[in-house]
C-alpha cells in the first residue's frame, strides 16, 4: 500500500507542474512580427500566391480622361489635321508658324480645300510631328512665263476662290506653258523641308486648258535624291465638286545641297520651306479634352500618372510613361509575410512567438517583443530592425520605376494598302514586344517579392539570434519564438534585453540556481512520459499480486474451491 501511495505521489508531481512563466522567479520573453487580419496576395518565384501584410499595385489601369497641358506644350488640332495645317488649308490658317510638343488630332478633323492625297502620308506626318513646328520661310522662286496663284471654288478663302497658302498653283500664261527650271540652294546650317505637288486633271480637255501640253512632267531633285512624276489624267470620285486630284510630295534639302525643280506642266510649286528641327515632339489621335493640369504621361485616353512602372491603359503614349503590359494587376510586396494571429492561446492566455504566428495590433513597428513577468505582460516594437527592413524595401518601387519609365513616345503606325505585309509584320513585332515586356514585368515583380519576403524573414531571425546571444544560459529557447528566463526579470530587465544593454553575468548565478531548483521539480516531457508508463506498469503488477493473494487466501479458508481436471 505504501508503494501505491508513493507512485501516486510521483504521478501527481508529474502532472501537477506550474505553467511556465507563472513563477515570480522566472519570466517569458517572446519575439514576433507584425500581422494583419486580412493580408494581400502576391506572386513570388516559388509561390503563385503568398500572403503579405502590405503590397503596392504596380499597374496603372485608368486615365484621368483629359489631356494635361503641362509640362508638355499641347497643340489642339481642333478640326484640322497636321497635314492640312502644313499645306495651309484656309480653315487651318490659325496654325501657321505654331510649335508643339504634342499635336492632338481630333476625329472631327476635315479637309476643306482642293482634294489631295499624299503617297507617303505617314512618313510626312511623322516627320513634321517630330519637328514640332510649322515655322515657314517664304523664298523668292522665279516662275517665268506662267500664271501663278491659281485657285479653286473648292477651296474658299473668304468670299472668293483660294488655294493652299503654302503652295503655288502654276498654270499657262496666255497659250504657253514653258519648261520651268528653277534652282534653290540651301546656304543655311539646318535642313529645309519643301512641299510640292502634281495636279492630276480629270479630263484631257482640263489638262490642255490649264497646261497646254497633253501631258506634263514634274522632276524635283537634289544631290541625294530625284523624283519624277507623270500626271495621271482621269476622273475620280467627286469631292467638293471636283473629280481631279493633287498629289503632295516632299523633299528635304540638307545644308550645302541644292533643290532643282524642272517641269513642263502640272506643277504645284512650293512658296518656301519649313525649318526642320530635331526633337521628341509627336502627334496623337485623341478626343480627350485638354485641361489645365500637370502630367508627364499622355495617352489617347487621357493623361495618366507615372508613379507606377506599368500601365495597361493604351499602347500609344507620349512622355515619361510606364511601360505597357497586358496584365491588369501586378502587386509588389512592401510588407512581410503575413501570418494572422490565432484567436486562442491555450490555458491562461499564454503568449507565443513568431514561429507560431504574427501579432496583430503592433502598429509602431514590424518586429517586437512581448513579455510576461511578475509585473504582468507588455509589448514593445524593435525600431532598429523595423527601420532596417523598411529602408531596403522603400527603394524597391523607385528602382522598378527607374528601370521601366523612359522618356519616349510610342507613335501610331500607318501603312498604305500596298504595304499591308509590312503592317502585319510591324504588328507582329509590336505584339511580341508587349508579350516580352509583360513576361519581364511579371518576372521582375516576382523576383522583388521573393527578395522582400526573404529579407523580412531574415531580419526576424537576426533579432532572435541577437536576443539569444544576450541571454545565453540565463534562458531557454522554448521552440516557438519565446525564451524562458530563469531569473526574476522585471520591466527594466526586459527593456535592457530589448535595447541590447542586458548583462547576463549579473543574473547568471540566480539563473543557474533557479534552473537547478526548477529542473529538480519540473520533469521534462520525455522523462515524465517514462515515469508515467513505469508507474502504470508497477500499479498493474501490484494490483495483480493483490488479486492473486486474495484468491489464495480465500482458497485456504475454504471460501473458494478450485478443481483442476486433466
From Swiss-Prot:
Glycans are attached at residues 24, 38, 54, 97, 181, 301, 499. Residues 552-566 are cytoplasmic. InterPro entries: Capsid_hemagglutn, Hemagglutn_HA1_a/b_dom_sf, Hemagglutn_influenz_A, Hemagglutn_influenz_A/B. HAMAP family: INFV_HEMA. This is Hemagglutinin. It is found in: Virion membrane; Host apical cell membrane. Gene3D superfamilies: 3.90.20.10, 3.90.209.20. Disulfide bonds join 30-482, 68-293, 80-92, 113-155, 297-321, 489-493. The chain crosses the membrane at residues 531-551. The keyword Signal applies. Its main location: virion.
Amino acid at each position: 500500500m505504501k508503494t501505491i501511495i508513493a507512485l501516486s505521489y510521483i504521478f501527481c508531481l508529474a502532472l501537477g507542474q506550474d505553467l511556465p512563466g507563472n513563477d515570480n522567479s522566472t519570466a517569458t520573453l517572446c519575439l514576433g512580427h507584425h500581422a494583419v487580419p486580412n493580408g494581400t496576395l502576391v506572386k513570388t518565384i516559388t509561390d503563385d500566391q503568398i500572403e503579405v501584410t502590405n503590397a503596392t499595385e504596380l499597374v496603372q489601369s485608368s486615365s484621368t480622361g483629359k489631356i494635361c497641358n503641362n509640362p508638355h506644350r499641347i497643340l489642339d488640332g481642333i478640326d484640322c489635321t497636321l497635314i492640312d495645317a502644313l499645306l495651309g488649308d484656309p480653315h487651318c490658317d490659325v496654325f501657321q508658324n505654331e510649335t508643339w510638343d504634342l499635336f492632338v488630332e481630333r476625329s472631327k478633323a476635315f479637309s476643306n480645300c482642293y482634294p489631295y492625297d499624299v503617297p507617303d502620308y505617314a512618313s510626312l506626318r511623322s516627320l513634321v510631328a517630330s519637328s514640332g513646328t510649322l515655322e515657314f520661310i517664304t523664298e523668292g522662286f522665279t516662275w517665268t512665263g506662267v500664271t501663278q496663284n491659281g485657285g479653286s471654288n473648292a477651296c474658299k478663302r473668304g468670299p472668293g476662290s483660294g488655294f493652299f497658302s503654302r503652295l503655288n498653283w502654276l498654270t499657262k500664261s496666255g497659250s504657253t506653258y514653258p519648261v520651268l527650271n528653277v534652282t534653290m540652294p540651301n546656304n543655311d546650317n539646318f535642313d529645309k523641308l519643301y512641299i510640292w505637288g502634281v495636279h492630276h486633271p480629270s479630263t484631257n480637255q482640263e489638262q490642255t486648258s490649264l497646261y497646254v501640253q497633253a501631258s506634263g512632267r514634274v522632276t524635283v531633285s537634289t544631290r541625294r535624291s530625284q523624283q519624277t512624276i507623270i500626271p495621271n489624267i482621269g476622273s475620280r470620285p467627286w469631292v467638293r465638286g471636283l473629280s481631279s486630284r493633287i498629289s503632295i510630295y516632299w523633299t528635304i534639302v540638307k545644308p550645302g545641297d541644292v533643290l532643282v525643280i524642272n517641269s513642263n506642266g502640272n506643277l504645284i510649286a512650293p512658296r518656301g520651306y519649313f525649318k526642320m528641327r530635331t526633337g521628341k515632339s509627336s502627334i496623337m489621335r485623341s478626343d480627350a479634352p485638354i485641361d489645365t493640369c500637370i502630367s508627364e504621361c499622355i495617352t489617347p485616353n487621357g493623361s495618366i500618372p507615372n508613379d507606377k512602372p506599368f500601365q495597361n491603359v493604351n499602347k500609344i503614349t507620349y512622355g515619361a510613361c510606364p511601360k505597357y503590359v497586358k496584365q491588369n494587376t501586378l502587386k509588389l510586396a512592401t510588407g512581410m509575410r503575413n501570418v494572422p494571429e490565432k484567436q486562442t492561446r491555450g490555458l491562461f492566455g499564454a503568449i507565443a512567438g513568431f514561429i507560431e504566428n504574427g501579432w496583430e495590433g503592433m502598429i509602431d513597428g514590424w518586429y517586437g517583443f512581448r513579455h510576461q513577468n511578475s509585473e504582468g505582460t507588455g509589448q514593445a516594437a524593435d525600431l532598429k530592425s523595423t527601420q532596417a527592413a523598411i529602408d531596403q524595401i522603400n527603394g524597391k518601387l523607385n528602382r522598378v520605376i527607374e528601370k521601366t519609365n523612359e522618356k519616349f513616345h510610342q507613335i501610331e503606325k500607318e501603312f498604305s494598302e500596298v504595304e499591308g505585309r509590312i503592317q502585319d509584320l510591324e504588328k507582329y513585332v509590336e505584339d511580341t514586344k508587349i508579350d516580352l515586356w509583360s513576361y519581364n514585368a511579371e518576372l521582375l515583380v516576382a523576383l522583388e517579392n521573393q527578395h522582400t519576403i526573404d529579407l523580412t524573414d531574415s531580419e526576424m531571425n537576426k533579432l532572435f539570434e541577437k536576443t539569444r546571444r544576450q541571454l545565453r544560459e540565463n534562458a531557454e529557447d522554448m521552440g516557438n519564438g519565446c525564451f524562458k528566463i530563469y531569473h526574476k526579470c522585471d520591466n527594466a530587465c526586459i527593456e535592457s534585453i530589448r535595447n541590447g544593454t542586458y548583462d547576463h553575468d549579473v543574473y547568471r548565478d540566480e539563473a543557474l540556481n533557479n534552473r537547478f531548483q526548477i529542473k529538480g521539480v519540473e520533469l521534462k516531457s520525455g522523462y515524465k512520459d517514462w515515469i508515467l508508463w513505469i508507474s502504470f506498469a508497477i500499479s498493474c503488477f501490484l494490483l495483480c499480486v493483490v488479486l492473486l493473494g486474495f484468491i489464495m487466501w480465500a482458497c485456504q479458508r475454504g471460501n473458494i474451491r478450485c478443481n483442476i481436471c486433466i
